[in-house]
């Protein structure tokens, strides 16, 4: 037996030891713990606003911290900032590349970012002295498409890419400060922890990873999915996160327990998940699907509590407002819908 085989064997035995330790510590399940909880009943939401203006598939959206404005990115080559109360377009920004896959709103409300098949993250300043929106910085450096980006603040942004890495960038200098390496497939999504000290990523290697932003290292890896992970989102308290995958399941992972707590699936659901978001309390998990619907899951009981049906094509993105009062869905049908 050569050295490589013996190392493989050693790695397997270590993995099994970790599995056994997890099992030993797992004295209850989420479903058992949730038996005494009152069921939440049927969740019925209505479309309160329809945002019309994009001329092609919408690929991404992100709410601003004011819970009023949101940014969306479409294949029509436009980034639109909307006022969701009035449905007015605050800004319509023409992009240099129409192959956009992600967009993000800075916490301050002063900047938006986007990127895609141009392999870079473009930052736009919404609050210039002249009143026009312009590119304030382009961040090239990834060797593959940009799948997701999220601002830490006005000068730092985290990106994920098809080059199997994530990156932390200094916007002022335009340089990548940290590269987060470890995934063995395209990284499709990321979610920042509420305290912004860590983030979680989901990738085509069917695993999710938790990263320490300051140390630049992977702290934990969460296997379990059987296909690409397309979406991740932190639980509101930062102690857990949910994933959505092409294997037609969403899953809840607990960081402290270092394992999967629940799986959200249904025999009738056979298509992939594109996007996930929690309600403000975390009791509801909203997930967008390839079958044009958005399913609402009871996080604790792992049961479906409702369906948001209204789009005529794939639901590609969704987001819950900071104040928890509304959810927006974006679709390949070119419309955004705001529900509550």
UniProtKB/Swiss-Prot annotation:
One of its GO terms (cellular component) is plasma membrane. It comes from the Eukaryota. Expressed in the brain neuropil and cortex, and the thoracic ganglion (at protein level). Expression detected in eye at protein level but not at mRNA level, suggesting cross reactivity of antibodies to the similar Gbeta76C protein. InterPro entries: G-protein_beta_WD-40_rep, Gprotein_B, Guanine_nucleotide-bd_bsu, WD40/YVTN_repeat-like_dom_sf, WD40_repeat_CS, WD40_repeat_dom_sf, WD40_rpt. GO terms for molecular function: signaling receptor complex adaptor activity. WD repeats lie at residues 53-92, 95-134, 141-179, 182-221, 224-263, 268-307, 310-340. It holds the Pfam family WD40_Gbeta. One of its GO terms (biological process) is mesectoderm development. The modification Phosphoserine is found at residue 29. Gene3D superfamilies: YVTN repeat-like/Quinoprotein amine dehydrogenase. Keywords: Phosphoprotein, Repeat, Transducer, WD repeat. G proteins are composed of 3 units, alpha, beta and gamma. Belongs to the WD repeat G protein beta family. Guanine nucleotide-binding proteins (G proteins) are involved as a modulator or transducer in various transmembrane signaling systems. The beta and gamma chains are required for the GTPase activity, for replacement of GDP by GTP, and for G protein-effector interaction. PANTHER family: GUANINE NUCLEOTIDE-BINDING PROTEIN BETA G PROTEIN BETA (PTHR19850). This is Guanine nucleotide-binding protein subunit beta-1.
């Amino acid at each position: 037996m050569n050295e490589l085989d013996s190392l493989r064997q050693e790695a397997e035995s270590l993995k099994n030891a970790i599995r056994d330790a997890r099992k030993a510590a797992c004295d209850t399940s989420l479903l058992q713990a949730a038996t005494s909880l009152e069921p939440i009943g049927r969740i019925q939401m209505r479309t309160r606003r329809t945002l019309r203006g994009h001329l092609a598939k919408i690929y991404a959206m992100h709410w601003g911290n004011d819970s009023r404005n949101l940014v969306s990115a479409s294949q029509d080559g436009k980034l639109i900032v909307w006022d969701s109360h009035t449905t007015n377009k605050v800004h319509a920004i023409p992009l240099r590349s129409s192959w956009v896959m992600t967009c993000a709103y800075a916490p301050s409300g002063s900047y938006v970012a986007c990127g895609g098949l141009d392999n870079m993250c473009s930052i736009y300043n919404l609050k210039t002295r002249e009143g026009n929106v312009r590119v304030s910085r382009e961040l090239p450096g990834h060797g593959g498409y940009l799948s997701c980006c999220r601002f830490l603040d006005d000068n730092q942004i985290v990106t994920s890419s098809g080059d199997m890495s994530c990156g932390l960038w200094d916007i002022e200098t335009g340089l990548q400060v940290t590269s987060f390496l470890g995934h063995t497939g395209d990284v499709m999504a990321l979610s920042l922890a509420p305290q912004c000290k860590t983030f979680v990523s989901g990738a085509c290697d069917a695993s999710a990873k938790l990263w320490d932003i300051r140390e630049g290292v992977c702290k934990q890896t969460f296997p379990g999915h059987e296909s690409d992970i397309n979406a991740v989102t932190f639980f509101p308290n930062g102690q857990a996160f949910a994933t959505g995958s092409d294997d037609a399941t969403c899953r809840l992972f607990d960081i402290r327990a270092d394992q999967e707590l629940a799986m959200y699936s249904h025999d009738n659901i056979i298509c992939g998940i594109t996007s996930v978001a929690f309600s403000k309390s975390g009791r509801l998990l909203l997930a967008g699907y390839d079958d044009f619907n958005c399913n609402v899951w009871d996080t604790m009981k792992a049961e479906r509590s409702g369906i948001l049906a209204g789009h005529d094509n794939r639901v590609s993105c969704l987001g819950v407002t900071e104040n928890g009062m509304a959810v927006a869905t974006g679709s390949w049908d070119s419309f955004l819908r705001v529900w509550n």
